[in-house]
Amino acid sequence: MIKSCETSLKSYPNDCDEASILQYLADISIHNNRDWFHENKDRYDEVHAAFEQIVSNLIDALSVFDPEISLVSVKSTLYRFNRDTRFSPDKSPYKRHFGSYINPKGKKSPHGGYYLHLQPGNCLIGGGAYCLESPILKAVRRNIVDDIDEFRSIVEAPEFKNLFPVIGEDHLKTVPVGFDRNFPYPQYIRPKNFAVMHKLPDEFFFNEGWITEVAKYFKIMKPFLDFVNHTIDDYI
């Protein structure tokens, strides 16, 4: 078990790897400089290895209902911890979170996948298709209009709506150009991306069975992913 070093304003229990990960991330959010990082490199190596094991376990859990996921390697889902500061006013060299985007098509694919984000006070799960190019985005919207009954049966299902009440992170103010202004469900074609997320308290990840629970959430999300991904498949 990783031992945490409680040097930040936030203090986590030291009896599980998830708490040690969050403790480290809380610490580096305060001491976000290269000297501190290198002085605590052993801690980083330990918590990052623990996060890789978490992702491996999550891949196994998702593979039960999404067999394509079994082919995904842990490394392919992870992101660099160093920040790209070239165009940012924030020159902090390191991120304040660990993230994993589990997508059999790869992180850079337009296809949607499953996302896990660990960050003190801002942990979440999510998924869907981000940063879609305009023609693909239009195709997804068009498919929603053409198959609105199927789409509504997915996103208005009580289990889904309870976890993911909002589709998309940013939205147009009006119906997109080229679509019927009288379409009765404009909220489903106004999103600028087709992603969903569900925030979770830090303490959620201290429970032994949290990966099983998150896998259940992702299973509920899968029909939404399938709808979006099938449209992308048809377009590409």
Regions found by a protein language model. Give the residues of each.
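N-terminal low-complexity, intrinsically disordered segments
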Residues: 2-7, 87-95, 202-205, 212, ...
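Extended cationic-aromatic binding surfaces that line active-site or macromolecule-binding grooves
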Residues: 49-105
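Aromatic/basic-lined ligand-recognition segments
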Residues: 81, 173-186
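Compact, glycine/acidic-enriched structural inserts
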Residues: 120-179
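Charge-rich, low-complexity terminal tails
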Residues: 183-236
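Contiguous, amphipathic alpha-helical segments that mediate oligomerization or scaffolding
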Residues: 20, 26-65, 216-235
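Acidic, low-complexity proline/glycine-rich segments
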Residues: 2-21, 188
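Aromatic- and glycine-enriched beta-alpha-beta binding-site module
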Residues: 84-145
